[in-house]
């Protein structure tokens, strides 16, 4: 409603058509629930179930405008896990924007609730205030392995170097007191 300007039925038809079409070209289709964190939960559950039935293997829940706080994001992921009957056939993913400075916290809340993929960027680079910073996500998960017992294949010794490479390539300086790097 907020971003797509389509009726609920038009959105459902678009999901079925687009995911089915994408499956003609690849088995690994990721579907994103545009503006998901401001969507009615019952309707979101319906869209996620349809996307999975249409062939999506990853369900991405974006906080498109960086509006959500961690307790809300956690509840969204928990609700999807508890109410979408075929959720076990897909990987739940997060894609959080940093407009309120909560992208990393929301992403981690999603993981703690059951999401298994985080979409993030080096230095948090992204539109408007940016996205969840990869280096912060990785180090938080590594440091707080007691709460998030998951691993990545990221060589943490290279995070600072990667940060500098991205900064030099984009021309966006890294703030002097940036967390982690």
List the model feature ranges, each with a label.
Residues 45, 101-105, 131:
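Glycine-rich phosphate-binding loop at the start of an alpha helix
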Residues 98-121:
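Small-aliphatic-rich amphipathic alpha-helix that forms the alpha element of a beta-alpha
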Residues 8, 34-37, 66-70, 96-100, ...:
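Hydrophobic alpha-helical scaffolding
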Residues 19, 24, 139-151:
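Conserved thiamine diphosphate
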Residues 1-92, 107-115:
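Alpha/beta enzyme core
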Residues 123-147, 181:
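Mobile "lid/hinge" segments at catalytic clefts and subdomain interfaces of large enzymes
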Residues 145-181:
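A mid-to-C-terminal "edge-of-domain" accessory segment
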Residues 61, 90-96, 120-123, 151-159, ...:
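Beta-strand segments within the central parallel beta-sheet cores of soluble alpha/beta enzyme folds
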